[in-house]
Amino acid sequence: MPASEQVDLAVEVFRMLSDATRVRLLWVLLDGERPVNELAEAVGKGPAGVSQHLTKLRMARLVRTRRQANQIFYRIDSSHVRQLVEDAIYHAEHSSGGVPEHHRGDAQQLSELRSADR
């Protein structure tokens, strides 16, 4: 059984992931570091609201920042965060039925192989 402090930290991480905008921001950040304006555009929200979400993610140690001139750039904090976000989205894709997005290339290849065998 994990220590109580670790469970509390895990609960905080899940609390941060309970917001769709924050999950979308983390998903965009899987592709690499981005400034606030690009993140806002990518998720279709205003920069002020996105900054508030990013502050929460930073305080939960899910993202890191880097300042360059008058811009703040955000990135995923660690490979653990990256894996958590990917696993959450992949789990959702598997739960919704059909062929998950991350398997569509595999399904296409399998279909082509089956067609070639006929």
What are these regions (language model features)?
Residues 1-9, 80-118:
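Amphipathic alpha-helical dimerization/coiled-coil segments
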Residues 33-34, 58, 89:
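Residue-level detector of secondary-structure transition/capping positions
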Residues 58-68, 75:
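Beta-hairpin "wing" of winged helix-turn-helix
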Residues 56-57, 75, 98, 107:
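Alpha-helical and His/Cys-centered functional microenvironments
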Residues 49-50, 68, 105-106:
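Intrinsic low-complexity/disordered segments
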Residues 53:
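Residues within the DNA-recognition helix of helix-turn-helix
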Residues 8-48, 72-80:
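N-terminal helix-turn-helix DNA-binding core of bacterial DNA-binding proteins
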